[in-house]
Amino acid sequence: MLAPAYTVAQAPPEWKDDFADHMIGAWTLTGPVMGHEAHHEVQAEWVLNYQFLRIHEKTAASAPASERPYEALWFLGYDAISERYVLHLLDVFGARYSETLGYGAREGNSIHFVFEYPDGPFHTTYRWLPETGAWQWLLEQKDKDGKWMKFADFKLTRASPKQ
C-alpha cells in the first residue's frame, strides 16, 4: 500500500487568551493621530476557529466632515512555537504596508509590537486599563533623526448600545 505524499495539517487548538478577550465587543476610539483628532468605531471578535482576534476599525459616521476617512482590519494572533503575539494590519493604505507583520510580547497589561517597515521601525502598544475598562493604543515611529515620536495616542472606551 502506498502512503500519501502529504499529510493534512491539523488545526491547532483554539487560542484562549483572557487578555485579548477584554477587547471583544464594540468600542469608541478617540485621540490624536499625526496632529489631527480621530473619531473611529472599533469592533473586535474571534475568527478563524479562535486563532485570531479580528479588530475592525473605521471612521465613525458621526466624525466631523473634515476628518479623513480611514478603515483597517487588524488580526491579532499568538504563535505558541515562537511564544509571541503576531499583529497583521490591512488598511486603506494598501498592500505595501500590509507586507510587514508586527511581533510582540506581553508585559503586564500591555502588548508591545514592533513592525520593521521598509522605511523604518514602528511600534504599536495595546494597553488594557482595568480600572476604567478602557484601552490605550499608542503608536510610535522614528523620525528622520532616529528619535521616537508619537504617531497616534488613542483611547478606546466601550461603545454605547445602539438604540
Residue ranges and their predicted role:
Residues 1-5:
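Bacterial N-terminal signal peptides
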Residues 6-163:
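Hydrophobic small-molecule pocket/channel-lining residues, especially in calycin-type beta-barrels
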